[in-house]
């Protein structure tokens, strides 16, 4: 199944091959060069490369690692069984083991996350923890303080370079898969979903079933803008808001939440932003 999915088939196994701003890449490369990974909390939107980087670090250094999806296994039983059992045993290679917890912001903040804090101290000699999350506000502060926190957030000046790098990578993948493509259409797909690299590849693979990536798919590529939603909310026009939700209900909800989250500083008073973040975190 993994080989069938392009996101897995073409997943980078080295930090040098990951599409990241240079400042992030140099930080992760320094871990590889030292062959030592600290506890990490990688934060950012879906598909921005957090899990890819975590796995590439382990692959390149040669660490044994365990993958856990926090959204599927969020309860304390996961800690008592998988996490604690794995962290307490010695690596077959003699080096440190790594536990990668994907979507750690879904771990129970009242039971599993506090237990994680104790485990990070108890097994520090034997095991490193790498957590990824979409919203760092959902991670308790004691875990923040025990990790190097790295936010996968692109600066304005980095966006064109990263988009071009992924455009090049997507072109190489389509060529390798022998899928004919129109470069202008590919650019539209990248533009719509950037910086969600995973979504771009999944969409390209879905569109490729027709045999090619050309103007025939453009009707499906139209981007979702939240400007109309924001205007409706400001005007308290709840009829228009319900209409917007009905028209865009098929979109990925996490992606929509992320768009709203990223726009807060542009559309809200600064004093209201903390309450909005807490409200979004509930969903």
Features from the language model and the residues they span:
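The catalytic "switch" region of P-loop NTPases
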Residues: 142-176
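Short amphipathic alpha-helix in the helical subdomain of ABC transporter nucleotide-binding domains
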Residues: 72, 79, 159, 163-166, ...
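P-loop/Walker A NTP-binding region and its immediately flanking N-terminal helices
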Residues: 1-156, 205
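AAA+ P-loop NTPase domains with strong preference for DNA replication initiators
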Residues: 22, 164-283
């Amino acid at each position: 199944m993994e080989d069938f999915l392009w996101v897995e088939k073409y997943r980078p196994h080295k930090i040098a091959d990951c599409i990241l701003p240079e400042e992030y890449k140099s930080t992760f490369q320094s871990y590889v060069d030292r062959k030592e990974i600290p506890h990490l909390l990688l934060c950012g939107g879906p598909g921005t490369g957090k899990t890819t980087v975590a796995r590439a670090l382990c692959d390149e250094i040669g660490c044994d690692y365990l993958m856990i999806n926090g959204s599927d296994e969020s309860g304390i039983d996961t800690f008592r069984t998988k996490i604690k059992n794995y962290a307490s045993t010695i690596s077959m290679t003699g080096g440190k083991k790594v536990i990668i917890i994907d979507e750690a912001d879904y771990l129970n903040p009242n039971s599993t996350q506090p237990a994680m804090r104790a485990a990070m101290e108890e097994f520090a000699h034997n095991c490193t923890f790498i957590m990824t999350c979409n919203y760092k506000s959902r991670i308790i502060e004691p875990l923040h303080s025990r990790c190097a926190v790295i936010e996968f957030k692109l600066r304005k000046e980095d966006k064109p370079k990263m988009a071009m790098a992924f455009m090049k990578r997507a072109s190489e993948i389509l060529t390798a898969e022998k899928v004919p493509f129109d470069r202008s259409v590919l650019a539209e797909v990248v533009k719509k979903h950037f910086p969600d690299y995973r979504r771009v590849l999944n969409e390209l693979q879905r569109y490729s079933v027709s045999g090619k990536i050309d103007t025939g798919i453009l009707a499906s590529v139209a981007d979702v803008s939240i400007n109309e939603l924001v205007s409706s909310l400001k005007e308290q026009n709840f009829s228009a808001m319900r209409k917007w939700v009905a028209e865009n209900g098929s979109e990925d909800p996490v992606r929509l939440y992320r768009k709203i989250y990223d726009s807060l500083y542009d559309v809200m008073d600064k004093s209201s932003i903390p309450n909005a973040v807490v409200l979004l975190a509930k969903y």
